[in-house]
Amino acid sequence: MTRLTLALDVMGGDFGPSVTVPAALQALNSNSQLTLLLVGNPDAITPLLAKADSEQRSRLQIIPAQSVIASDARPSQAIRASRGSSMRMALELVKEGRAQACVSAGNTGALMGLAKLLLKPLEGIERPALVTVLPHQQKGKTVVLDLGANVDCDSTMLVQFAIMGSVLAEEVVEIPNPRVALLNIGEEEVKGLDSIRDASAVLKTIPSINYIGYLEANELLTGKTDVLVCDGFTGNVTLKTMEGVVRMFLSLLKSQGEGKKRSWWLLLLKRWLQKSLTRRFSHLNPDQYNGACLLGLRGTVIKSHGAANQRAFAVAIEQAVQAVQRQVPQRIAARLESVYPAGFELLDGGKSGTLR
């Protein structure tokens, strides 16, 4: 395994260094080839490194940052005032080649805008999309995008997301001829917004895309599709709703029957069932899938949930490691160029169009 260097925006997220720094130490424990650049306020970071041993410290470097982009800041204002911020400096380390990826739990809009500004989109891609890979009930995986990078999406952007998601599913997740679907309010052709119907019409004309039509949100985890495409607003709401339901379900498994008097054998049976069911459904725990890749950039950027705990942020760091090792941007760029050498020129309803 080759050595990797990641830049962490340790000031981002709801909890800042109190979560991100312990998560960084956890990541170092699990990967001896990993070096981390901790970007943020040294006064807030240093006390949290007290438990780090000398070997861990040799693979850590604090990069001082002057400010933090607030989670509630408007993206346009945040970008204009971003110089010296932990988020921008972490991205600049990737741009300069000092780090191979950036991980941040900070303001999504600001991260999207700064990443696009500093790292640039791949040739032919208008706007990057946040993508994650979720488990489904058939014991496989589903690629889902966009998860919040782009609130408003036209049909061109949805088609681009479908292309990138299909390439990611085939090249990285290793799903041959992945099925692609658009998230909609029904499976009928007449359902949905104009942008969704227009994107559907274009996807039907692309031979290299295994487009299967519309899918409803209640089928997200059924395994009916390998790639699910939607606008960022819908994707973000869908993902967080699913995560909330899963957390409630897992919590109920642990707490069911507490405080009630039972005979000893019923208590033993209850505890056995709780442990068995918890193990059975533990793979659905959202913490295990924290970290969405900002797909479509020339560099690797991972967005963690703002409310991520230590375990979840450590998972986001591991997602960055895997994205770098699998050369996600390079493989997507190479595949896009080979499959769409004309710059994604398409025919849409008899009219010449482009996805640039």
Swiss-Prot record:
Tell me where it resides.
Cytoplasm
Cellular component per GO?
cytoplasm
Family membership, please give it.
Belongs to the PlsX family.
Q: In which pathway does it act?
A: Lipid metabolism; phospholipid metabolism
One GO MF term on file is: phosphate:acyl-[acyl carrier protein] acyltransferase activity
Q: Does the keyword Lipid biosynthesis apply?
A: yes
Q: Which GO biological process annotations does it have? A: fatty acid biosynthetic process; phospholipid biosynthetic process
- Pfam families registered for this protein in UniProt: FA_synthesis
Reaction equations catalysed: a fatty acyl-[ACP] + phosphate = an acyl phosphate + holo-[ACP]
Q: Which organism is it from?
A: Shigella dysenteriae serotype 1 (strain Sd197)
EC code(s) of this entry? 2.3.1.274
- What does the UniProt record say this protein does? Catalyzes the reversible formation of acyl-phosphate (acyl-PO(4)) from acyl-[acyl-carrier-protein] (acyl-ACP). This enzyme utilizes acyl-ACP as fatty acyl donor, but not acyl-CoA.
Mind telling me what this protein is named? Phosphate acyltransferase
- First-level EC class: transferase
Assembly mode = Homodimer. Probably interacts with PlsY.
Cite the entry's keywords alphabetically: Cytoplasm, Lipid biosynthesis, Lipid metabolism, Phospholipid biosynthesis, Phospholipid metabolism, Transferase
